[in-house]
């Protein structure tokens, strides 16, 4: 809570690059712009911004070093469905724009359906199922089905398929 939005994104640049201060500032602005954070929020602290904005700051920090891989651990936890969808779309667009491989750990089936391509289902530390989101509804894996179809909407979708 002691580092501003701007400082949060600058942190990996300070730690792992020899960029000039001007170059760092330009990169910070670039990253924050890409996650739709306006300059007036740069000096704010985490306690002064919404949960959705905090997630976007974390994503901006994650892309600051222009990684090949983006790892997201429960990127939608604590967010309302509308904001979660915004975060999913943001991750999806950044993945394409920066040509990164993105790995998302989530319990949110909406996210899996929204942005998943290859899906790995793990239960109690064991790989249970691997496939595409298109194959999920027709999976014969009982543990996967129990997890997914606890939601009545998905259960109705399965009956219809």
Locations of regions flagged by a protein language model:
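Conserved ABC ATPase signature
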Residues: 45-49, 53
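Conserved catalytic motifs of ABC-family nucleotide-binding domains
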Residues: 66
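Short helical segment in ABC ATPase nucleotide-binding domains corresponding to the A-loop/adjacent helical element
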Residues: 6-14, 25
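Catalytic Walker B motif of ABC-type/P-loop ATPase nucleotide-binding domains
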Residues: 70-73
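Helix N-cap at the start of a conserved alpha-helix in ABC-type nucleotide-binding domains
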Residues: 81-83
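Conserved ABC ATPase "signature" region
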Residues: 22-40
């Amino acid at each position: 809570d002691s580092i501003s939005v701007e400082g949060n994104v600058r942190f990996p640049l300070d730690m792992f690059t020899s960029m000039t201060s001007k170059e760092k500032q330009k990169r910070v602005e670039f990253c924050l712009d890409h996650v739709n954070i306006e300059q007036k929020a740069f000096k704010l602290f985490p306690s002064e911004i919404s949960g959705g904005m905090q997630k976007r700051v974390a994503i901006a920090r994650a892309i600051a070093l222009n990684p090949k891989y983006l790892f997201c651990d429960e990127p939608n936890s604590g967010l309302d469905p509308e904001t979660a969808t915004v975060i999913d779309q943001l991750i999806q667009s950044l993945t394409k724009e920066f040509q990164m491989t993105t790995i998302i750990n989530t319990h949110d089936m909406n996210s899996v359906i929204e942005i998943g391509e290859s899906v790995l289902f793990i239960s109690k530390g064991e790989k249970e199922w691997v496939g595409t989101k298109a194959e999920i509804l027709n999976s014969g894996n009982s543990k996967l089905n129990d997890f997914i179809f606890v939601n009545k909407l998905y259960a109705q979708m399965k009956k219809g398929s």
